[in-house]
């Protein structure tokens, strides 16, 4: 999704590439690892680690926000150990809310409650898309769209 956005803006993206990461130990200060994403748009360069999570939206509680925060923080911690070579560092979380099929009549209400919980997560920016057409497509659950939360460090 982000790679495609970079390309559409005349930039480029490189996914899943090898890089040295810091261990924090003197004996072996680095190890060879993988970075999820490199983006260049205009003069700006970014490296990012991304995580994905399913997030229950049938019953939103304080734990919902905390779980999203924790998963975003995992991405932040992962990018923190990658040396900065002139790039800005991003922790990214892609989250998909799901709603029990039995709550189909309340999808809009439950989705709005989930969005309120998601937007209370401290991050640099967030975006979401929940097209009306997809709000009622269901398998085991209703998965009406997705959100992305980005935290720059």
Task: Report each predicted region and the residues it spans.
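Conserved helicase motor "Helicase C" RecA-like lobe of SF1/SF2 P-loop NTPases
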Residues: 1-4
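A short acidic/basic microdomain associated with nuclease active sites
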Residues: 6-30, 36-37
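Secondary-structure boundary elements
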Residues: 8-12, 42, 84-85
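Short loop/turn segments at strand-loop or loop-helix junctions that form parts
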Residues: 18, 49-53, 95-98
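Short, solvent-exposed coil/turn elements at secondary-structure transition points
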Residues: 19, 53, 131-135
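Conserved catalytic cores of phosphodiester-cleaving nucleases, focusing on short active-site segments
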Residues: 35-58
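Mg2+/Mn2+-dependent nuclease catalytic core
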Residues: 54-84
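Glycine-rich, aromatic-bearing surface loops/beta-hairpins
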Residues: 86-153
């Amino acid at each position: 999704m982000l790679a495609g956005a970079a390309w559409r803006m005349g930039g480029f993206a490189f996914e899943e590439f090898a890089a040295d990461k810091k261990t924090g130990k003197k004996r072996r200060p680095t190890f060879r690892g993988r970075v999820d994403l490199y983006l260049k748009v205009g003069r700006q360069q970014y490296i990012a680690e991304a995580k994905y999570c399913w997030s229950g939206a049938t019953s939103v509680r304080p734990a919902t926000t905390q779980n999203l925060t924790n998963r975003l923080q995992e991405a932040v911690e992962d990018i923190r150990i990658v040396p900065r070579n002139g790039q800005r560092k991003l922790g990214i979380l892609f989250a998909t809310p799901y709603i029990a099929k039995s709550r189909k009549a309340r999808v809009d209400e439950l989705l709005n409650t989930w969005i309120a919980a998601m937007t209370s997560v401290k991050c640099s920016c967030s975006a979401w898309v929940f097209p009306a057409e997809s709000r009622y497509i269901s398998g085991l659950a209703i998965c009406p769209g997705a959100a992305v939360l980005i935290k720059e460090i």
